[in-house]
Amino acid sequence: MRDPPAPLFRRDNMLEFYFSYRGVLKRLRSGALGGEMDRLAEHFLTLGYKRASAKIYLSRVARFSQFAATRCGLMPIHQDVIDSYLGTFTTDTPRIGAVSALAHARRVAPERFIIPVPSEEADPDALLLASFSDYLRTVRGLEPKTREGILLGGRRFLDWFRHRHPGQNLEALTAEHVLAAVEHRLSLSATSGTRTAATSHIRTFLRFLCWAGHHRQDLARIVPRTPYWRLAHLPPRLAWGDVRRAIDAIGATTPVAIRDRAVLLLLATTGIRNGELRAIRLQDIDWRTGEVFIRRTKGKRDRVVPLLEETGAALVDYILRARPKVDSPYLFLSFTPPVGAFKSAAPVSRIVRKRLRHGGVELGRVAGAHLLRHSLATQLVGQRRPINEVADLLGHRSINTTALYVKVAASQLAEVALPFPGGAA
């Protein structure tokens, strides 16, 4: 059962939303963190925590606040005080609960804590990787998700080099070292796609080392290119009847079910990517034209996708009846506190897998938002829809990419009229 809407409280008396007894309120507002407890109460309310859960967290922080007052009074709280408090617990469960509650307190009132400064020696490559990240962003112009993968590749290369050649400077890096590192990475890669990505990431990192002056030579040319046939395998996809059955199996009886049905319908009827779905804001839906604005996609350009009537109705139902009442601009929100936008692709993938299995669909190794994207593309091509129309819907800049997704025949590609260089038809 959902909590009733919160009445209006001033920021200095938010505790009254959760507690009513004067003695309890007085105890909560005393101690080392007493002056921050109303802010903390507002924090839990803003994040959509249920009342019972918020009261538990507030009580845990209050117990620590009383303990800290005996050690440091109203002075900033040092890590030693926290460690001493956690040492009073004899079992893991209450200790874990206290750690979680204190994490919220630190987030709300960081000025009340003295955070130990980590040793610069803890990560000798931190500055180098930060510079590499800046290079990928400013020089290469790459998106955050792409940078994340390449940074991981650079980190793995450095870890290998530090482990195999401890104490050596990167200037000592040789072609033999590079080939050995590549061989090591390829031995850990199971598919042609991951092997190609691994060598590409190493190549990019080595170019950066030369560009930034960390090595006198560009050793990227040493990295061998791995064969990768993009059209060698059919992309995983479902029969459209299976997709339809999974959607119909979702009963719109709970807020979670209403949200999940809207998620599956939007993915299945527009072919948008996982990250694109998570980035949709309420203001991105044009209800008059029946369209959704998709921001700066994988192809680095915005696009618009059409809303089918059924999908639009599901979104309306979700917004009016199920969407948590929190201050967030994003369309789809997690129901697990802290309530807010999905922070990664994993929750959306779990929703897709759960609902497909519930609908009796047999799943292979790949089962996420992209499975529905492949399925829609295959369905559209099977209906003889123009390939360029499918490419526009999916946000592909090249029809060749659409061919990769849907495995179309060369004869169908030939039907597409390509523009003549210079603008003539």
UniProtKB/Swiss-Prot annotation:
Residues 233-418 form the Tyr recombinase domain. The active site is at R273, K298, H370, R373, H396, Y405. CDD domains: INT_RitA_C_like. GO terms for biological process: DNA integration; DNA recombination; establishment of integrated proviral latency; symbiont entry into host cell; viral genome integration into host DNA. Gene3D superfamilies: 1.10.150.130, Intergrase catalytic core (1.10.443.10). InterPro entries: CB, DNA_brk_join_enz, Integrase-like_cat_sf, Integrase_catalytic, Integrase_recombinase_N, Tyrosine_recombinase_XerCD. Residues 123-210 form the Core-binding (CB) domain. PROSITE patterns: CB, TYR_RECOMBINASE. Keywords: DNA integration, DNA recombination, DNA-binding, Plasmid, Transposable element, Viral genome integration, Virus entry into host cell. One of its GO terms (molecular function) is DNA binding. PANTHER family: PHAGE INTEGRASE-RELATED, TYROSINE RECOMBINASE XERD. Belongs to the 'phage' integrase family. This is Putative integrase/recombinase y4rF. The lineage of its organism: Bacteria, Pseudomonadati, Pseudomonadota, Alphaproteobacteria, Hyphomicrobiales.
